[in-house]
């Protein structure tokens, strides 16, 4: 059974331009499942995605999985409060259903990345984007897993983030929004998943400090994105400061 269902699958549409148009319309209508299926269909056709299309794919799945992540957090909190009560079993069943949905979506994205999107022919920027995305979705799996499964997803996330980081440091400027977004998410991974606040702070601070020295050279078309991510890095450093020994 597919992780996400949509009328687009039944329509049999395989025209690249039409699917991109559908994805854009779906985004405006906040129908993110349709948006995700449209972009997945393009990727599975073997077409290399341009920058706009990569962002459409990312936004679609971020919203689809984001709804489940939010539901899982709420249900997990309720389950803890209701432990030992008559509603405990029902709550646990519901929590597992949400967890299954989230897991299927993450595995769907990870399969798409490894089988269709990360190829030898794509450029460095696309490769960094996809490895970052791979790290993100393994991180989302690790959030809801325990034991050996959690260990495997955590290791896979770190490996993907590290591949993206090595490429980004060689290929992208310190103010590039993809490089900054990668540093933001990698630092969150260390803070939330690996419980390594000092490592998280060190990574976030290095990225912020490097970018702030080059802030005047940011291109107009990326200025808004880059400065927004820099602010998020700074916000996290402020939030985490009590647990860090770095000079922030």
Curated annotation (Swiss-Prot):
SUPFAM superfamilies: 14-3-3 protein
Domain of life: Eukaryota
Pfam families recorded: 14-3-3 (PF00244)
InterPro entries: 14-3-3, 14-3-3_CS, 14-3-3_dom_sf, 14-3-3_domain
Entry similarity comment: Belongs to the 14-3-3 family.
Protein name (database record): 14-3-3 protein homolog 2
Organism: Echinococcus granulosus (Hydatid tapeworm)
């Amino acid at each position: 059974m597919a992780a996400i269902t949509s009328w687009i699958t039944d329509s049999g549409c395989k025209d690249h331009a039409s699917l991109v148009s559908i994805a854009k319309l779906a985004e405006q209508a906040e129908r993110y499942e349709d948006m995700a299926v449209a972009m997945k269909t393009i990727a599975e056709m073997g077409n290399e995605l341009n920058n706009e299309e990569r962002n459409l794919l990312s936004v679609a799945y971020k919203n689809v999985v984001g709804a489940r992540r939010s539901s899982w957090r709420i249900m997990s909190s309720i389950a803890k409060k209701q432990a030992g009560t008559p509603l405990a079993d029902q709550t646990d069943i519901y929590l597992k259903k949400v967890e299954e949905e989230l897991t299927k979506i993450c595995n769907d994205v990870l399969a798409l990345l490894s089988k269709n999107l990360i190829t030898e022919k794509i450029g460095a920027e696309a490769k960094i984007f996809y490895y970052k995305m791979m790290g993100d979705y393994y991180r989302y799996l690790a959030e809801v897993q325990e034991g050996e499964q959690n260990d495997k997803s955590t290791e896979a996330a770190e490996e993907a983030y590290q591949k993206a980081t090595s490429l980004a440091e060689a290929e992208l400027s310190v103010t590039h929004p993809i490089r900054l977004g990668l540093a933001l998410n990698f630092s969150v991974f260390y803070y939330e998943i690996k419980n390594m606040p000092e490592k998280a702070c060190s990574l976030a601070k290095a990225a912020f400090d490097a970018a702030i020295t080059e802030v005047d050279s940011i291109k107009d078309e990326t200025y808004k994105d880059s400065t927004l991510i820099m602010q998020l890095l700074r916000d996290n450093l402020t939030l985490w400061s009590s647990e860090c020994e770095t000079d922030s």
